């Protein structure tokens, strides 16, 4: 059952078209991603999600590759095909030395790709916090100290956790709207 229609540029209100223009300009893309077009019926919802995406995923101190790997891990573990596809493609584009097998191993916690040593630690911690939020209450798990030990500042820890929060929200949204993916992942 299709739960959402995508609002194409030519069918969008002038306010949504302005947001689409900003999105395409910021992302350097000639098109708007489907999950954003699914929100094209409501400029307030679109602007809210776009602002979160821009501030959390596109901008910031944390390397884009690490953010995409976190988003991929949360999405694949959660079983979200749209976000797995989107972030898998993004990660492979950011680091052409990575393979689909590397990403699959990463989702199982066994990645041997040539990543900075802090990346797998951050990916595991943030994905656990995102997928099992009550786990942060465990008195034996001091995830902040673990991240600091890997060289992350308090500001970077906040940003990492924000990526985790964003991933949960986007997985829920794209599943609820049944957003069609731009291209399958792994690539066919």
What is each of the regions a protein language model found here?
Residues 1-188:
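Hydrophobic alpha-helical segments
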């Amino acid at each position: 059952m299709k739960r959402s229609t995508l609002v194409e540029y030519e069918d969008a209100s002038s306010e949504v078209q302005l947001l689409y223009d900003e999105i395409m300009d910021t992302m350097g893309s000639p098109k708007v991603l489907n999950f954003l077009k699914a929100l094209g019926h409501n400029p307030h919802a679109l602007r809210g999600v776009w602002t979160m995406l821009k501030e959390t995923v596109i901008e910031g101190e944390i390397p884009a590759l690490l953010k995409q790997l976190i988003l991929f891990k949360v999405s694949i573990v959660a079983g979200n095909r749209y976000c797995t596809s989107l972030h898998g493609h993004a990660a492979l584009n950011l680091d052409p030395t990575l393979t689909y097998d590397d990403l699959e191993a990463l989702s199982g916690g066994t990645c041997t790709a040539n990543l900075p040593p802090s990346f797998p630690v951050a990916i595991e911690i943030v994905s656990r916090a995102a997928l099992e939020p009550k786990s942060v209450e465990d008195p034996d798990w001091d995830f902040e100290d673990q991240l600091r030990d890997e060289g992350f500042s308090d500001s970077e820890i906040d940003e990492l956790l924000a990526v985790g929060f964003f991933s949960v929200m986007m997985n829920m949204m794209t599943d609820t709207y049944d957003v069609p993916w731009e291209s399958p992942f792994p690539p066919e």
